[in-house]
Amino acid sequence: IPNGLDISRAAPLLCAGITTYSPLRTWNVGPGTRVGVIGLGGLGHMAVKLAVGLGANVTILSRSKNKETDALELGAHRLLDTSDTEAMQHALNGFDVILDTVPVRHDINPYIPLLDIDGTLVVVGQLGLLEEQFTVPMIMGRRRIAGSMIGGIAETQEMLNFCARQNILPDCEMIRMDQINEAFERLERSDVRYRFVIDMSTL
């Protein structure tokens, strides 16, 4: 871990950080790339910070308009309300890469037409079956659905060095060992911004 990175906040970089950094690098995200991020949780908030750090134009895609303040505070340039039919229509062909960080089964069909020609939607959050896919938008726009997991040791080190240079760290809440059960209950309520870190000195 590079000097200058807060150890307590660096821990989630080895999971959420590399999980989102790897696809951003694989799909050549850089200055001017139009990136959408579905989901604003542990993975999503890191995707925003890293994509902004790489120079991308970043939009959070969410059904919850009330997440807009959080999205902007994390560095996103805007929030697209995916429940707004007119807003979704205006966003067609508007993204080069979309990172889907949602961890539960959901319909990704509405997001495919948001990709520009040769655009890619990368699934990093959901393990399991996808909903049935309507293939016309993929065929007509040469759009792709891909998946990505974590990176190797070299890419993880690259990510850590990048975060140290850009001063990028996850938003964390430190908890004691005796708070673990409470933390699990809060996770079930989505009551965490955005990662818990256990203080092992409290063992």
Residue locations for each model-derived region?
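Short glycine-/small-residue-rich Rossmann-like dinucleotide-binding loops
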Residues: 102-103, 125-126, 202
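C-terminal hydrophobic helical "lid"/dimerization subdomain
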Residues: 153-203
